[in-house]
Each structure stands twice: as C-alpha cells, then as structure tokens.
Amino acid sequence: MASLCFQSPSKPISYFQPKSNPSPPLFAKVSVFRCRASVQTLVAVEPEPVFVSVKTFAPATVANLGPGFDFLGCAVDGLGDHVTLRVDPSVRAGEVSISEITGTTTKLSTNPLRNCAGIAAIATMKMLGIRSVGLSLDLHKGLPLGSGLGSSAASAAAAAVAVNEIFGRKLGSDQLVLAGLESEAKVSGYHADNIAPAIMGGFVLIRNYEPLDLKPLRFPSDKDLFFVLVSPDFEAPTKKMRAALPTEIPMVHHVWNSSQAAALVAAVLEGDAVMLGKALSSDKIVEPTRAPLIPGMEAVKKAALEAGAFGCTISGAGPTAVAVIDSEEKGQVIGEKMVEAFWKVGHLKSVASVKKLDNVGARLVNSVSR
C-alpha cells in the first residue's frame, strides 16, 4: 500500500495518424512505425458479449527508467485509472460513447476519437470485429495529466482491457498493447514504454516495433523494491519535453547509456535494487536536457541520493521524480527530503508516496454477467 511521506506547504511561490517527418531527428520515432499503427481485425467470428458491464483498473507507470529511453518501463502499485464499460443499446452498433469523466481531471474530451480511453476502446473493438454491439464508457482518472506517470497509457490500458473482457478475453496482452499504441500515437508518440507495463505489469523491455516484440522482465518476488514518487505541482507536457531532446549525441554517451541500460536489465532479473538504482540514475542523454525544465529537479535528485536512495531520475517525461530503495521506511524519509528540495529550490509544492512494483498490470475489478 502507498504511504504518504510528506506534503509541502500550500501557497508556494485510432485512428489519428501523426504526420511523418521526412528528416526525423535522432530521437524521433521512425515514420514507418506511425503510418502502420492502425490495427486490423484479428478475430474470424465476431464474439458476443459475456458481460453486461465490467470495471477495470490500469496502473501508473514509470517509463525510461533513466537510460532506457523509449524501450524500458515498469508499473507501480496503487495509482491508476478505472474504466467502467457497459453494453448500451442506445449507442450505435460498433461504436463507443463516453458517458462520464471523473477524478483528477474532468477537462478531457468526451469525444471517443479525441480521448485516450476512447481511441483504445475503438481499436480493441476493431481487432475483435465488433459490429453489432454499442458500448458506453465511464473514465475515472486517478492520475493527473502531464505527471510523468503514464496517465494517458493508464486510461488506454484500462479501456482496452475492458473491451477485451466484456467480449470474453479473446485478445492477448501483445495485441492489447497494439490497441493502446493507437491511443499513445495520438497523445505522445508511438512508443510502448508506458502502455506495455500498464497492460502487462512488472518491468517490460520493448525490443522491436515491427513486429512488436515485448520482453517481460521479472523482478524476483523474494527481493524488496520500492519506488519513491514525488510529484510537484507543475505540468510537463510530453510533447514539450520531447521537443527538448538532443538531435545529436556523442558516441561516448551512446556507449555509456547502452551499458547502463544493460546493467539495469541485469539488475531487474537478479533482484539487485542497488545496481538498479545506480543504472537508473546514470542517464547522460535525456535527463540532462529535461531536468533544467523542471524547477528544482537537480536539487531533488541530489537530496534523494544524500538521503540514501540507490538512484533517482525523472519518471517518463516528468515532472515526477522517482527514486529507488529497498525499504518503505527509508523511502518515507527520502520522499520527505525530495519534497523539501522541490519546495526550497524549485518553489513547488509536491506530494511524495512510496510504491511497490505492480506485477499484475491492467485487470478486471468486477463484472456483471448477462
């Protein structure tokens, strides 16, 4: 369960195809991935719904994990989004209607073609070949937008799994990730380091996109691993943070980051939280360009390490900072120091929590049979 570490004082100072870039910079997604994102029907016979309604949950995620930019991510326990999906005769067959959005934000569009959950739901329905049933969807946001915790991926994952469940679980996790990528391509780019762990749980390595090749990395269950998540009151839009990425990198930095990403994978498989933290904290390519855009981030990382964290970096595109430790009690102390640094140096109020790894991923919470 999550533990609130410390809260700083109040009053501080689908089917949308992104346009391809004829000359993509080093860190841009290759346009061929984007133009081939549209999903295809995978089920020969249209399945009938086995439930009248379902409720699903998908967890928050930490993408990049330092040197694993766009190809490593993990799910964290206790934070995420819920989707309630119903068979609705008033909705046109083969379509989805978003009835309600509640939670941390209500400013999201209820147009399913402009909503992460809606796009993923439509993509999943297309994969299943659903043409004779209409669905209505309620989205409860447990994650704020632009937090660096995979908010869009959580919505997409919960929606994709909800559609799959209501029609009898005909699709596998890799196929659901593809459906979720339809949504991610619209919001933040065609990369799976949030949506894959949101659906599959645990750590996930994205080895390839054409074809999609996902490698679950299992952290040993008998080893302790905790994430200290500190989210400041500051929005870091993914598109803005991606625009800050360098277009060229020195070969020595490429070699360094590659070795640290390999060390991080080894640390996960061995259950070595210390090495995991060191590798996570070692990025020389992405973090140095993004940290200056988040007030106080460099001081927050320093405070985390001085307080005993094994490592600290930016979660996803930020602004959330993530530190790694092997004890919940130590994590609470580290979180307090990180919050203080955000306040003193960045003049930002923030909230810290200590979370375990979520090894389950998106799942069914409850259902009503026909």
UniProtKB/Swiss-Prot annotation:
Binding-site list for ATP: L143, P144, L145, G146, S147, G148, L149, G150, S151, S152, A153, A154
Molecular function terms, GO-annotated: ATP binding; homoserine kinase activity
Gene Ontology cellular component terms for the protein in this record: chloroplast; chloroplast stroma
Domain of life where this protein originates: Eukaryota
Transit peptide, start-end: 1-34
The protein's annotated pathway: Amino-acid biosynthesis; L-threonine biosynthesis; L-threonine from L-aspartate: step 4/5
Keywords for the protein's UniProt record, in alphabetical order: Amino-acid biosynthesis, ATP-binding, Chloroplast, Kinase, Nucleotide-binding, Plant defense, Plastid, Threonine biosynthesis, Transferase, Transit peptide
Function: Catalyzes the ATP-dependent phosphorylation of L-homoserine to L-homoserine phosphate. Is specific for L-homoserine and cannot use other substrates such D-serine, L-serine, D-threonine and L-threonine, galactose or D-homoserine in vitro. Required for susceptibility to the downy mildew pathogen Hyaloperonospora parasitica.
Listed name of the protein: Homoserine kinase
